[in-house]
């Protein structure tokens, strides 16, 4: 397939490696009971709207949390739009059931691609997609804008910084819902183009 021509360092592209099917991997997914695969049209809209709501909140200087807070306003925050290709590649990876691991090569012909992963589970109902994105947003509480992204803080703030990375333009996500040990689990992989989270670059330009 065409993704075998996209090279990242020395690793095969996710879609080259695992094939073009968006069916869950029989090898890894048999440990859980999968109940649904992929994001609905409604969920797509919720993903884009929630990213843009939060990006605008930060851009307008309304985010009071931080270490220290508040976060400064931004002058260059793009509005994100949905990208089906990013979503497709994210879905192929989500379907491998390699939970909490990032794939090594997810770029498109157009973009270097970044990625956020989230998981939540409940006995009552599948956690909603917005609640998963909010987990990423909440990392703002540990972020120091003037310090930016460092090797030391990256594990604590890297999801937040990708969500609000000003130069990112598009997002596409894949998801699976499954039951494991009686828990209704929702696993979300979002891919971002162009990628954020470059060390030494500001996450956005201060207004």
UniProtKB/Swiss-Prot annotation:
Q: From the Swiss-Prot or TrEMBL record, give the protein name.
A: Venom allergen 5
Q: Which GO terms describe its cellular component?
A: extracellular region
Q: In which tissues is it expressed?
A: Expressed by the venom gland.
Q: Which family does it belong to?
A: Belongs to the CRISP family. Venom allergen 5-like subfamily.
One family name in Pfam for this protein: CAP
Q: Where is the SCP domain?
A: 48-192
Report the SMART domains cross-referenced here: SCP
Which species is listed as the source?
Answer: Polybia scutellaris rioplatensis (Camoati)
Where, per UniProt, does this protein localize?
Secreted
Q: Tell me the SUPFAM superfamilies matching this sequence.
A: PR-1-like
The domain of life for this entry's organism is: Eukaryota
């Amino acid at each position: 397939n065409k993704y075998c021509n996209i090279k990242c360092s020395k690793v095969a592209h996710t879609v080259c490696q695992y094939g073009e099917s968006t069916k869950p991997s029989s090898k890894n997914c048999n440990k859980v009971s999968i109940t649904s695969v992929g994001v609905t049209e409604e969920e797509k809209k919720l993903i884009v709207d929630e990213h843009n709501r939060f990006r605008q909140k930060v851009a307008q200087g309304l985010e009071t949390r931080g270490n220290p807070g508040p976060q400064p306003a931004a002058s260059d925050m793009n509005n994100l739009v949905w990208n089906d290709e990013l979503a497709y590649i994210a879905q192929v990876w989500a379907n491998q059931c390699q939970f909490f691991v990032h794939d090594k090569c997810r770029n498109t012909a157009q973009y270097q691609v970044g990625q956020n992963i989230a998981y939540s589970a409940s006995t009552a109902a599948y956690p909603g997609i917005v609640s998963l994105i909010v987990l990423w947003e909440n990392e703002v509480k540990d972020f120091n804008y003037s310090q930016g992204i460092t090797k030391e803080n990256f594990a604590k703030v890297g999801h937040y910084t990708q969500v609000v990375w000003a130069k990112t333009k598009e997002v596409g996500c894949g998801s699976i819902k499954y039951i494991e040990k009686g828990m209704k689990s929702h696993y979300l992989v979002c891919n971002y183009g162009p990628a954020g989270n470059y060390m030494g670059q500001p996450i956005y330009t201060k207004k």
